[in-house]
A protein has these predicted regions:
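Active-site and ligand/interface coordination hotspots across diverse enzymes
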Residues: 1-55
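Peripheral docking tails and interdomain loops at the edges
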Residues: 3, 121-166
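Structural motif
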Residues: 36-40, 116-122
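Short, solvent-exposed amphipathic alpha-helical segments in soluble enzyme
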Residues: 49-59, 130-132, 270
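Short connector loops at secondary-structure junctions
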Residues: 61-84
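A short, acidic, amphipathic alpha-helical segment used as a generic capping/interface helix at domain edges
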Residues: 90-112, 250-254
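Anionic-ligand-binding alpha/beta catalytic cores of soluble enzymes and soluble regulatory domains
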Residues: 153-231
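Beta-strand/loop-dominated core regions that host nucleotide or nucleotide-derived cofactor-binding catalytic loops
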Residues: 205-303
Length: 303
């Protein structure tokens, strides 16, 4: 699915507004944040410009400035809808676009060293809300040899982040985006990943989720559902024994009101995670509806 975002009105599309709201929860890793412009090609890392940037910036916290979504930490670039939207990258921004991105930049980078390689509206959004930063861009061309040289030399003055810490931070950022502010607790210190494309997320050797590269989100296993249950996140309570992979709304006693359609949820009975799957309704609708499917299960506890 591709999200078409080609005008200023796109700022107020529900998916763009929801993304910016979730970006307010995100936290950077390390002492330095490197700000980069977005690219037409998605995910950004596949673009020629970002391949040049990444040779210099991959060991730092990277933050991509974009509209209408505001900002995108590098670790979320594969996440829907940011990985599939279509938008002009001319660099000419409206005042509303400058404001929406600028506010998020200021909040995300608070207390951090900021190294920017920006021009045009991207730079305007930074200048409007942040006073202390270093911009290495020359002649409005972030990919020029001079700009890249300046970026390389400036980053020599800043501390890189540890690879293991970076991996954990990436996994926790995705969990925070998907499950809310406490979501990063879904990823324990001992978590390991296996797989080149879709990544299996393992805790103590047990798979808790699959990180789906196509959407950049976790697909839960039952063990992961048990973790979510203990965290009190995305819970759907039922009062019957599961016999199929479909949970109908009339059998749902209570549901987390933060749940939206297509969210990953854990189905709980008698304080035990008995199933995990995808929400079809909002949590409130699950409680109020007298018919219809509430959850489609991917895994369930079988006796």
């Amino acid at each position: 699915m591709q999200a078409i975002c080609s005008s200023e009105e796109s700022l107020y599309r529900p998916e763009a507004v929801r993304w910016r709201q979730r970006m307010e929860m995100m936290k950077p890793l390390g002492d330095t944040v490197v700000l980069l412009p977005c690219s037409m090609k998605k995910p950004y890392s596949n673009s020629k410009s970002h391949q040049k940037f990444r040779k210099l910036t991959r060991s730092f916290q990277e933050l991509i400035v974009t509209s209408p979504f505001g900002i995108c930490p590098r670790e979320l670039e594969n996440t829907f809808p940011i990985q599939s939207y279509d938008v002009s990258t001319t660099g000419s921004w409206s005042s509303d676009e400058v404001e929406e991105s600028g506010k998020l930049i200021a909040k995300y980078c608070e207390g951090k060293n900021i190294v920017a390689n920006l021009a045009g509206g991207y730079l305007e959004s930074l200048e409007a809300f942040v006073d202390d930063f270093t911009n290495v861009c020359v002649d409005g061309r972030p990919t020029s040899n001079d700009s890249l040289y300046n970026l390389r030399m400036e980053l020599k003055n800043h501390q890189r982040v540890n690879r293991r810490e970076k991996t954990l931070h990436e996994l926790r950022s995705i969990a925070r985006y998907q499950f809310g502010e406490d979501g990063d607790r879904f990823i324990a210190d001992n978590v390991k990943t296996k797989g080149m494309y879709h990544k299996r997320i393992l805790s103590d050797g047990t798979q808790i989720a699959l990180l789906n590269k196509d959407y950049g989100l976790y697909r839960l296993n039952l063990a992961g559902g048990e973790i979510l249950k203990d965290l009190g996140i995305h819970i759907v309570n039922i009062d019957f024994d599961l016999q199929t992979n479909t949970v109908f709304a009339p059998g749902i006693e209570k549901a987390d009101h933060s749940i939206l359609p297509n969210d990953e949820v854990v189905v709980v009975r008698d304080n035990t995670a008995v199933g995990v799957g995808r929400a079809v309704m909002t949590g409130r609708e699950m409680e109020e509806c007298n018919n219809g499917i509430g959850v489609k299960l991917k895994h369930r506890l079988k006796k």
